[in-house]
Amino acid sequence: EPYLITLTTESDVFPIFQHDGSEFIYMLEGRVAYRHGRNVYDMKAGDSLFFDADVPHGPEKLKQLPISFLSVISYPTSRRKG
């Protein structure tokens, strides 16, 4: 499932997420400190991250707004609709 995420000064604080599957993030605009488990990645336009979504993850610090990134989630086969 693809999602286009945009964060601005009016965005709510992002919680930490955790869900089944794998996730791929591709930064389009801005800068963010993105947490995955105990690691924090400083990400800017052009950067990408692929990770196990079972591990807690999410934006930790919004460094340069607006922030825009593509998030593509691949859920386990049992969750996919036929």
List the model feature ranges, each with a label.
Residues 15, 35, 69, 79-82:
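Short acidic, gly/pro-rich beta-turn/loop elements at beta-sheet edges
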Residues 37-53:
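Short acidic-glycine-tyrosine-enriched beta hairpin
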Residues 6, 17-34, 72:
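Short, conserved beta-strand element in jelly-roll/cupin
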Residues 16-17, 24, 40-41, 61:
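Short secondary-structure boundary/capping segments
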Residues 44, 53-80:
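Ligand-binding loop in jelly-roll beta-barrel domains
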Residues 1-19, 39, 53-56:
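Conserved short histidine dyad/triad with adjacent acidic residue
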